[in-house]
Amino acid sequence: LIIGEVWEDASDKISYGVRREYLYGEELDSVMNYPLRGAVIDFLCGRIGAEEFDARISSIRENYPPQAYYALLNILSTHDTVRILTALSGVAEPATRDEKAAFRLSGEQYDRARRRLFAAYTLVLLMPGIPCIYYGDEAGMQGFSDPFCRGCYPWGAEDCEIRDKVAALIALRKSSDAFSSGEIHTLYA
């Protein structure tokens, strides 16, 4: 299985002036689902509504071959991105390296981000594809983009509530194949 690190829609990617056939040639089996990450963050931070969120995740499902869609690596953070807890806080990234290194969410920012994080994990862990949790996200690690997202795991200082809720969602996912290989049908109320 070869999963590529393609940050955009891999079905229609143009790189260096050339259309790439990542999912339609003999290149990649699937990709890291950065479009899902962006849609989840934008939706939970209130930058897009439910219809736009649905349109963005539906375009992935519609554009990708089924075998690539069901093998998507569904991510919220990676070694190159802002940590999901920090991203969901809605705070602006500081301008300097020193400010980024020293930054920690306030209690109110952390609580807001954590509520959004529970919703984010619910969405990502119950979507078709392969969920991937970047080390420390399940423990409440914070950090801006590389290298500030690559800190040491907080042994002994984990946010146990996040860890326990993620574990419960993983158990729920394992309880039914519908979560990994089922279909999504949008219902509007």
Label every PLM stretch briefly.
Residues 1-72, 123, 140-168:
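Active-site-proximal helices and loops of the catalytic beta/alpha 8
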Residues 10, 46-139, 156-157, 173:
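Catalytic-core region of carbohydrate-active enzymes that cleave or remodel glycosidic bonds
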